[in-house]
From Swiss-Prot:
The keyword Transmembrane applies. GO terms for cellular component: membrane. InterPro entries: TB2_DP1_HVA22. GO terms for biological process: hyperosmotic salinity response; response to abscisic acid; response to cold; response to water deprivation. This is HVA22-like protein e. Keywords: Membrane, Stress response, Transmembrane, Transmembrane helix. It is a multi-pass membrane protein. The chain crosses the membrane at residues 12-32, 42-62, 63-83. It holds the Pfam family TB2_DP1_HVA22. It comes from the Eukaryota.
């Protein structure tokens, strides 16, 4: 049983960097090289949210140490953000981040240029 727990622990520790960094880095490079703008939006949104999550963790570190499932919850949330089936990063960006930036005047509305 100890070996099983050790193996699961090691897998859990390895899953974080793979899900949070390696796959998004690879997918971001592929997105930049593709002609589509849709995947660019997904990965820019992901890096914005991941940066915010990391900054929040730094600020709340002493509190998060008391939450035993924090790392697992973060791993599941980030997996939802990055998996192409869900496109969670683009969803959160469009529904939360963009709206808050507009609300506080940080993001100006797009102005359509008319042909002369």
């Amino acid at each position: 049983m100890t070996k099983l727990w050790t193996s699961l622990s090691a897998l859990h520790s390895l899953a974080g960097p793979v899900v949070m960094l390696l796959y998004p880095l690879y997918a971001s490079v592929i997105a930049i090289e593709s002609p589509s703008k849709v995947d660019d939006e997904q990965w820019l949104a992901y890096w914005i949210l991941y940066s915010f999550l990391t900054l929040s963790e730094l600020i709340l570190q002493s509190l998060l140490e008391w939450i035993p499932i924090w790392y697992t919850a973060k791993l599941v949330f980030v997996a939802w953000l990055v998996l192409p089936q869900f496109r969670g990063a683009a969803f959160i960006y469009n529904k939360v981040v963009r709206e808050q930036f507009k609300k506080y005047g940080i993001l100006k509305p797009k102005v359509e240029h008319q042909a002369e």
